[in-house]
Curated annotation (Swiss-Prot):
Pfam families reported for this sequence: Pribosyltran
Protein name: Adenine phosphoribosyltransferase
Catalytic activity as recorded in UniProt: AMP + diphosphate = 5-phospho-alpha-D-ribose 1-diphosphate + adenine
Alphabetized GO MF terms: adenine binding; adenine phosphoribosyltransferase activity; AMP binding
Subunit structure: Homodimer.
Alphabetical keyword list: Cytoplasm, Glycosyltransferase, Purine salvage, Transferase
Disulphide linkage map: none
Organism encoding this protein: Gloeothece citriformis (strain PCC 7424) (Cyanothece sp. (strain PCC 7424))
Length: 172
């Protein structure tokens, strides 16, 4: 199935010159959504990625991370922006092109012996995915790899990530 045809392209959003890759059309297509999750699952199995937890990056990583975790027999844990999680958190600050940002995960969500797979809808510059991996490594988790639906190849995000398996289904 060609899931690229199910992803809507919105020019000049959120600002002029940017083409936004809108996955809501993929999510709304039952066969496309099933194919996407089944394909991610199959690729994880082929690469022998057997996580204890799938880590979903805020917020579209939640949409693909939960069903993937279910398919892999793993738990699901969200990594969120500051102030979104109610209990004690581990935090990492990371640099953006202009400034910095933070990510958080509950302190009791994972431990140093857990094997994790990081999931998001898209990899662009790789900064957020790298920060998520660094946060989990700081806790002591074993990061097994990454899974994304879309890769924006010209932005070079893959090069910022650790030398681990990276699954992508569509590239632009």
């Amino acid at each position: 199935m060609d899931i690229k045809s199910l992803i809507r392209n919105i020019p000049d959003f959120p600002k002029p010159g940017i083409v936004f890759r809108d996955i809501t059309t993929l999510l709304g297509h039952p066969e496309g959504l099933r194919y996407t999750i089944d394909t991610l699952t199959q690729k994880c199995i082929e690469l022998n990625l057997r996580p204890d937890y799938v880590i979903g990056m805020e917020s579209r990583g939640f949409l693909f991370g939960v069903p993937l975790a279910y398919q892999l027999g793993a738990g699901f844990i969200p990594v969120r922006k500051p102030g979104k999680l109610p209990a004690a958190v581990h935090t990492i600050e990371y640099d953006l092109e202009y400034g910095s940002d933070k990510l958080e995960i509950h302190q009791d969500a994972v431990a140093d012996h857990h094997r994790v797979l990081i999931v998001d809808d898209l990899i662009a510059t790789g900064g957020t995915a790298r920060a998520t991996a660094d946060l989990l490594a700081k806790i002591g988790c074993e990061v097994l790899g990454f899974a994304f639906i879309i890769e924006l190849k010209d932005l070079g995000g893959r090069q910022k990530l650790p030398d681990l398996p990276i699954i992508t289904l569509v590239d632009y």
